[in-house]
Amino acid sequence: MKTPVELAVSGMQTLGLQHRCRGGYRVKARTSYVDETLFGSPAGTRPTPPDFDPPWVEKANRTRGVGKEASKALGAKGSCETTPSRGSTPTLTPRKKNKYRPISHTPSYCDESLFGSRSEGASFGAPRMAKGDAAKLRALLWTPPPTPRGSHSPRPREAPLRAIHPAGPSKTEPGPAADSQKLSMGGLHSSRPLKRGLSHSLTHLNVPSTGHPATSAPHTNGPQDLRPSTSGVTFRSPLVTSRARSVSISVPSTPRRGGATQKPKPPWK
């Protein structure tokens, strides 16, 4: 009689032997065609690989080969020897020519519009679109004309153009007025009679700009304004700048006094 410990040890040894025998027949060495192309020609000559079969043929061959492998496995159980089939070439290899390439395909609506002219004209669209939808899509590519024809409200479009002419001189007049103010403030450091004459001339220039922007200016400016002018800005701005240049040249020529000079009130106060 064997002790339970000895029985357990012998059972473990027999299980290990059975596991080794079962693992031996499952491992099979098949011919590989990778080393020939990647690592040079092999030591022994091997047959050329045949053409591959389609996937559905491979599945059928696999189901048939399962029974053959099972019968071979039963025969190999008794001997527990690994017999690699090196001479047999597998039939599950790809074919060189692909006979199952798809010929027909669904139509695409992107490549025709991006990479070429459409053969069916501009009205070509997807089948799921209605005629109204196609017309709406075409309207997105249309650019409106500069002036609407036959519109019910043309006034809002022309109103800004009409308002520009009267508002132009009034908006641009603060520029010469600001220049005159700067000149009058800058000339306060000079002598008193020069400042008074300059202030009177500046007020004389500013009065027609506020009262009558277009008609009173030719009377004050003299024969230089006999030529036609398109707007009030074009013939006033050069006169003011020329006057300002003459004043800026004449002001530094007068001797400046120290802090004893009293600043008179500007004409606008």
UniProtKB/Swiss-Prot annotation:
Subcellular location: Cytoplasm; Nucleus; Cytoplasm, Cytoskeleton, Microtubule organizing center, Centrosome
Region (Interaction with RBPJ/RBPSUH): 128-156
Polar residues bias spans: 80-92, 200-253
Interaction with tubulin: annotated span: 156-269
Keywords: Cytoplasm, Cytoskeleton, Neurogenesis, Notch signaling pathway, Nucleus
GO CC annotations, alphabetized: centrosome; cytoplasm; nucleoplasm; nucleus
Region feature Disordered, mapped onto this chain: 66-105, 141-269
Gene Ontology BP annotations: negative regulation of Notch signaling pathway; negative regulation of transcription by RNA polymerase II; neurogenesis; Notch signaling pathway; nuclear export
GO molecular function terms listed in the Swiss-Prot or TrEMBL record: tubulin binding
Extent of motif Nuclear localization signal: 92-108
Motif (Nuclear export signal): 5-17
Highest taxon, organism lineage: Eukaryota
Function: Tubulin-binding protein that acts as a negative regulator of Notch signaling pathway. Shuttles between the cytoplasm and the nucleus and mediates the nuclear export of RBPJ/RBPSUH, thereby preventing the interaction between RBPJ/RBPSUH and NICD product of Notch proteins (Notch intracellular domain), leading to down-regulate Notch-mediated transcription. May play a role in neurogenesis.
Family: Belongs to the RITA family.
Subunit composition and interactions: Interacts with RBPJ/RBPSUH.
PANTHER family given in the database record: RBPJ-INTERACTING AND TUBULIN-ASSOCIATED PROTEIN 1
Protein name: RBPJ-interacting and tubulin-associated protein 1
Species name: Homo sapiens
